[in-house]
Amino acid sequence: MPKKFYVSWDNLQREARRLARRQLPVSQWKGIIAVSRGGLVPAALMARELGIRNVETLCISSYDHNNQRDLVVVKAATTAGDGEGWLVVDDLVDTGGTAKAIRDLYPKAKFITIFAKPMGEPLVDDFEVAIPQDTWIEQPWDMALEFAHPICDEE
């Protein structure tokens, strides 16, 4: 079983704010392209911190159950052209498969992620947190807080 790295809402917001600060000045951006689905929350945080209201989505999907799959663009950010002046935001770059497809679609965009693993790191222009390749990231939107029974209840 791979190692796990748990991300809280507080940590995600803090890391997003640090990453956003490096994207100034805002005047260089026409808008944000949020990579669905993992990049939707980080893109919302970036849009808020940078005061950007023009947010497009890029929806990339894959098929074939749980196996490594071919990428299919379900919806492109059509107003972004070749990406010049656009900030592409995703939560994570892992092996680089999705990142390569994004680079092909928007070669002139600046591509940023909150988290980066070594195999994907060369494909992004900026990221905030380096994560080992063999580590699974548990994002806050994939987790739920639950009641923890007191230890004395185990007796």
Curated annotation (Swiss-Prot):
Listed under catalytic activity are: GMP + diphosphate = guanine + 5-phospho-alpha-D-ribose 1-diphosphate; XMP + diphosphate = xanthine + 5-phospho-alpha-D-ribose 1-diphosphate; IMP + diphosphate = hypoxanthine + 5-phospho-alpha-D-ribose 1-diphosphate
Q: Which UniProt keywords apply?
A: Cell inner membrane, Cell membrane, Glycosyltransferase, Magnesium, Membrane, Metal-binding, Purine salvage, Transferase
Asked if the record carries the keyword Cell inner membrane, the reply is yes
Q: Which residues bind 5-phospho-alpha-D-ribose 1-diphosphate?
A: R37, G38, R69, D90, D91, L92, V93, D94, T95, G96, G97, T98
Where GMP binds, per the record, is at: R69, D94, T95, G96, G97, T98, W136, I137
* Residues annotated for guanine binding in this entry: D94, I137
Task: List residues binding xanthine.
Answer: D94, I137
Q: Does the keyword Magnesium apply?
A: yes
Q: What is one process in the GO biological process aspect for this record?
A: XMP salvage
Per UniProt, what is the membrane topology?
Peripheral membrane protein
Cofactors demanded by this protein: Mg(2+)
Q: Which PROSITE patterns does the UniProt record give?
A: PUR_PYR_PR_TRANSFER
Its EC number(s): 2.4.2.-, 2.4.2.22
**Associated pathway:** Purine metabolism; GMP biosynthesis via salvage pathway; GMP from guanine: step 1/1; Purine metabolism; XMP biosynthesis via salvage pathway; XMP from xanthine: step 1/1
Q: Which family does it belong to?
A: Belongs to the purine/pyrimidine phosphoribosyltransferase family. XGPT subfamily.
PANTHER family named in the record = XANTHINE PHOSPHORIBOSYLTRANSFERASE, XANTHINE-GUANINE PHOSPHORIBOSYLTRANSFERASE
Q: Which HAMAP family match?
A: XGPRT
User: What is the protein's given name?
Assistant: Xanthine-guanine phosphoribosyltransferase
Q: Which organism is it from?
A: Aeromonas salmonicida (strain A449)
User: Could you read off the lineage of the organism from its UniProt record?
Assistant: Bacteria, Pseudomonadati, Pseudomonadota, Gammaproteobacteria, Aeromonadales
Q: Which gene encodes it?
A: gpt
